[in-house]
Design a protein with these regions (language model features):
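N-terminal beta-alpha supersecondary unit
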Residues: 9-93, 122, 126
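Conserved phosphate-binding/catalytic loops in two-lobed NTP-binding clefts
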Residues: 119-120, 299-321
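Active-site neighborhood for divalent-cation/phosphate handling
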Residues: 96-98, 106, 111-137, 155-156
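A contiguous, well-structured pocket-lining segment that forms one wall/lid of small-molecule binding clefts
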Residues: 196-283, 292-304, 329-332, 349
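Short beta-strand scaffold segments in enzyme catalytic cores
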Residues: 25-31, 143-145, 151-155
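Glycine-rich phosphate-binding/hydrolytic loop that grips phosphoryl groups
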Residues: 310-347
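Conserved phosphate-binding catalytic cores of ATP/NTP-utilizing and phosphoryl-transfer enzymes
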Residues: 2-13, 120-142, 324
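Glycine-rich phosphate-binding loop plus the immediately following alpha-helix
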Residues: 135, 158-202, 233-234, 238-241
C-alpha cells in the first residue's frame, strides 16, 4: 500500500484532518507537536425534525459544506495548503455514505498536492483526543469511549495499541440518552437537555435496571465487560406509559435523574471491573457522553484519576483525527486511492 512512514511528524509539520463519520462536518489543522491551530465543526441541524440522523441527508450535507469547512480550518490556522505536510481522514466506523465524502475530499487534496494520507479509525481518534488536552495523557491507561454510535472499553498500551475489553451489544450510551430524552419529550438531540432536566430531579425516585437509585437493582448484563442499554430504554418506556401523561409531566425531572444515574452506573460497573482485571491506575474518557457531568462524577468515585478532554474534543471533531494520525502510518500516492470506508460494526479492512 506504499506506506511512506510510521513516525511522529516534525513539531512544525501541519496536519489537515477531516472527520465526516456521522452528522458533523469537521476540519482541523494540528501541528506535529499536537498544538491545535484550528478545529472547525459544522453541525447538521436538519436532522432535528426527524428525531435522528438520516444517512442520505447527512451525506448530502457533508457534500454541501465540506469545502467551506476546509477553507475555514485553513483560514483560522492562518495556513495555506502549501504549508500542509499530511492529510488525515476518518476511514470508519460510521455511516458509509458520510465517510465517503470525507475520504474522497481527503484523497483529492492529497493527490493534488502530492501529500501522504493517513486513514484513521474514528474510535482511535477519540482515544487520541486525550493527547491534545491541556494536561496531555500518555499511555498506558484504560479508556472508555461512549458516544451516540459507540460504547467501548479498552486498554491502551501505547499510541497505536488499543485492546478492546468490552463493547455494547445493542444501543450505545449516547443513543440511550437521546432515546430517553425523546421519551420524556425533550426532542433530538437530547443528551444535553436530559442532563439539564436531571439536575432538578432526584435520582433515587425511580428504579431502573443497573441503576443508581436507592431502589435500583443490578441488571442481568452487569456481569462481564460488555454493555447493554436496550433494557434500560425499554424500562423507561414502560414507566412513562404506566405513569400517564400528567404524572410524567409532574415528575419528569425525577425520571430524567434516575435514568441518567442508571446509565452512569452501567458504565461505572464495567469500568470498575476492568480496572480490577487489568490493574490499570488511570482512566481516560472519549466521546460525547464524556461531556455529561453526572457520568464524569460517577466515574471519579471509582478512586482512580479520570482524564477527560475539553468538551469540544469529546464530541466528534477533526483535531482528534489529526492527533491519531501523528502516531500512525501515512500512505503515498497511489496506494491510498484504494482505501474504502467501513461501517459501524464492520471490521477495518
Amino acid at each position: 500500500m506504499n506506506v511512506t512512514a510510521v513516525r511522529p511528524p516534525r513539531p512544525d509539520e501541519l496536519i489537515l484532518a477531516l472527520e465526516t463519520s456521522c452528522d458533523d462536518t469537521c476540519a482541523a489543522v494540528v501541528d506535529g507537536s499536537g498544538a491545535i491551530r484550528s478545529n472547525v465543526i459544522s453541525s447538521q441541524g436538519v436532522h432535528d425534525r426527524f428525531g435522528g440522523v438520516v444517512p442520505e441527508i447527512a451525506s448530502r450535507e457533508h457534500l454541501r459544506v465540506i469545502n467551506t469547512a476546509v477553507d475555514d480550518a485553513l483560514s483560522r490556522a492562518a495556513a495555506t495548503l502549501d504549508e500542509i505536510g499530511l492529510v488525515a481522514v476518518t476511514q470508519g466506523p460510521g455511516l458509509v455514505g458520510a465517510l465517503l465524502v470525507g475520504l474522497a475530499t481527503a484523497k483529492a487534496l492529497a493527490a493534488a498536492r502530492g501529500l501522504p494520507l493517513a486513514a484513521v479509525d474514528h474510535l482511535q481518534g477519540h482515544v487520541a483526543a486525550n493527547y491534545l488536552a491541556p494536561e496531555r495523557l500518555e499511555p498506558p491507561f484504560l479508556c472508555l469511549i461512549a458516544s451516540g454510535g459507540h460504547t467501548l472499553l479498552g486498554s491502551v498500551g501505547d499510541h497505536e495499541d488499543f485492546t478492546v475489553l468490552g463493547r455494547t451489544v445493542d444501543d450505545a450510551a449516547g443513543e440511550a440518552f437521546d432515546k430517553g430524552a425523546r421519551l420524556l419529550g425533550l426532542g433530538y438531540p437530547g443528551g444535553a437537555a436530559l442532563e439539564r432536566l436531571a439536575a432538578e430531579g432526584d435520582p433515587g425516585s425511580f428504579a431502573f435496571p443497573g441503576g443508581g437509585g436507592r431502589k435500583g437493582n443490578a441488571s442481568a448484563f452487569s456481569r462481564g465487560l460488555d454493555f447493554s442499554f436496550a433494557g434500560l430504554k425499554t424500562a423507561l418506556l414502560y414507566k412513562v406509559r404506566d405513569l400517564g401523561a400528567d404524572e410524567v409531566t409532574r415528575r419528569r425531572s425525577d425520571l430524567a435523574a434516575a435514568y441518567q444515574a442508571a446509565i452512569a452506573d452501567a458504565l461505572a460497573m464495567r469500568v470498575q471491573r476492568a480496572l480490577l482485571q487489568t490493574g490499570a491506575d488511570r482512566l481516560a474518557l472519549g466521546g460525547g457522553v464524556a461531556a455529561n457531568g453526572a457520568v464524569r462524577e460517577r466515574l471519579r468515585q471509582l478512586g482512580v484519576p479520570v482524564h477527560v478532554p475539553p468538551r469540544e474534543l469529546c464530541t466528534d471533531n477533526a483535531a482528534m483525527i489529526a492527533s491519531a494520525a501523528r502516531f500512525g502510518p501515512r500512505l503515498a500516492y497511489p496506494g491510498y486511492l484504494d482505501i474504502d470506508a467501513y461501517a459501524t460494526g464492520e471490521r477495518r479492512p
